[in-house]
Amino acid sequence: KWCAPLLDLPAHCYPQSYFARRIELGASEVNRLFLTACGVTHSLIETGFRGTEIHGPDGMAKLAGHKVDKVIRLETTAEKLLDTGTVTSESFVTDFARELAIAAKGAVGLKSIVAYRYGLHFEPSPPSQQEVQKAIEPVLRQVDSGAPARIDDPILLRHLIFAGLELNLPIQFHIGYGD
């Protein structure tokens, strides 16, 4: 019910005391105390946004003291692949399918941020390979110029979703913070 008692403080302590105690214990210990006390027994974690700045599944499992499974973000997987500079418009469909299958090993689900990048009013059918090849060309030029890949073309976003469906994993559609 109250966070302060988990830190060995009175429930209604002064804010200064609360923050001082958090600083004294350190972020890892405070996170461990809160996560183990919350009663959650299984978590899912998606590391596609600022993945190097957060705990991955193993780190969260250690902190939380319970099972943590991973969810793979489609757009991040594709953009990391494109940023390697090894992809062509002809190879993208096959290369992405391979990379997604590798990334999804052991995952319990996938996630798309199509709503954030384009919206949810998109053609609900898979694009043709020719459409994907044409749509990926501007992204490849972007990467060739030294900029990081960013997929926001509706044809490419649809392709990622339909490629994800081939893995028979559930897909979460991010439509806002906290979903």
Residue ranges and their predicted role:
Residues 1-167:
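Metal-cofactor-binding active-site regions of metalloenzymes
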Residues 177-178:
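Short glycine/proline-centered loop/turn elements that form peptide/ligand docking sites
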